[in-house]
Amino acid sequence: MTVAQTIRSRIMAQGAGKRVRRAQIGLIYCAVQLESGSTGVAFTFPAQRSGQPCGAGLSGQGNLAGRSAGQLIEHLGSEELVSSALGMAASNAVIAECFADPHALGGDILDHLDIREGDRICMVGCFLPVLERLGNLAVEVTTVDQVAKPGAEPAERVERLLPESQVAIITGTSIINNTIDDILRLAAGCREVAVLGPSTPLLADAFRDFQVRCLSGIRVDDPDAVFRIIGEGGGFRFFKAVSYTHLRAHET
């Protein structure tokens, strides 16, 4: 199974019994809140979805509130990116309510990775705060991204860079657009593989067969604040009402 299929299979039974209180699709992120208050977010790929028809899939239906979370989760991995993102956000909300891991860790993601002097690190997706902190270490860092960014290599370079690396730091958004499975195959020789970002599902069990060592995501502490930021087109750097949460996927 793919990563998206594995996540769906692990949580669908719980998701079918949870109702959506509200859902919101912003410019950069979407959010789903359950009746319990548990909330998840996911990236909506604003730069990549311009060729997709307006109102395609779940995003054009206008009646997400009141549905079962399972109805959204089943769209995780859909070719329609916003529908897949809503499926990821609903998955994260269900995981936060039903699968909270007692082994979750706080602090800085770099505190939980086995990074050694001289390591080659390939970052798939550009996380500027992490990149800045890596700059203080005696390592070689290369970033690849689908969107052209200063200092980032084109996405196709990942086929050469990842197999040459000891550490892979992979954006959780790659689950949404179905690129993570190929990326993980390329990272098979890496000593340390981490999946990072607000979209990342904190479900260690779903990654045990995919050599992912660390999951780094968020817990939404103030849903109203997060919905307001997303509704106003804000991105991750404005997410203040969240807690950064990390799991060692093979040690729980």
Task: Write out the residue ranges for each language-model feature.
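Short, Gly/Pro- and small/polar-rich lid/capping loops
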Residues: 1-21
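Conserved class I S-adenosyl-L-methionine
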Residues: 120-123
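Conserved small/polar residues in nucleotide/adenosyl-binding loops
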Residues: 245-252
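An anion/phosphate-binding loop that grips the pyrophosphate of nucleotide cofactors and donors
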Residues: 165
